[in-house]
């Protein structure tokens, strides 16, 4: 019974957290300013309806933080997550990136793990050559794992990237506890 409660709590953690945040934020009665949730849903909808590009995702590496794992565990883990994915994306008027994606890759146990969601990155172009770009943002989506019986699990993770032109090396870090989580995951994203 305790295990079932933990599974349900994990399953609805993101939903409950977002609901609490939305309820606790003050309403801006009579202003034209949108709340963060309306901005988020508008960006997702616009990316779905009006994509500028289609993207190919190629998983590149997973790395289990050695300080957070027993060596006997990391020796058994897969850190070459072959797979692939597809997405659509756009750049907004501020130069920020928005993307919708689905991807499947081999996880730490060499089992298939699907993930899909929305990603956003604030983008900087620090060099005179505007093709070079750096990004920092988040992804919100859903994944499912073999060791969790493929029950859909919401994810909210940081994103970072470095790119040149249509090729971007994008990455995230999955936080966790000892021998669980604490995984760096990166992929190439090619924009067409």
From Swiss-Prot:
Signal sequence region: 1-29
Coiled-coil region: none
Keywords: Acyltransferase, Cell outer membrane, Membrane, Signal, Transferase
GO cellular component, one term: cell outer membrane
GO terms, biological process: lipid A biosynthetic process
Enzyme Commission number(s) of this protein: 2.3.1.251
GO molecular function: acyltransferase activity
Oligomer status and interactors: Homodimer.
Annotated function: Transfers a fatty acid residue from the sn-1 position of a phospholipid to the N-linked hydroxyfatty acid chain on the proximal unit of lipid A or its precursors.
Protein name: Lipid A acyltransferase PagP
Organism: Citrobacter rodentium (strain ICC168)
The organism's taxonomic lineage, starting at the top: Bacteria, Pseudomonadati, Pseudomonadota, Gammaproteobacteria, Enterobacterales
Gene, per the UniProt record: pagP
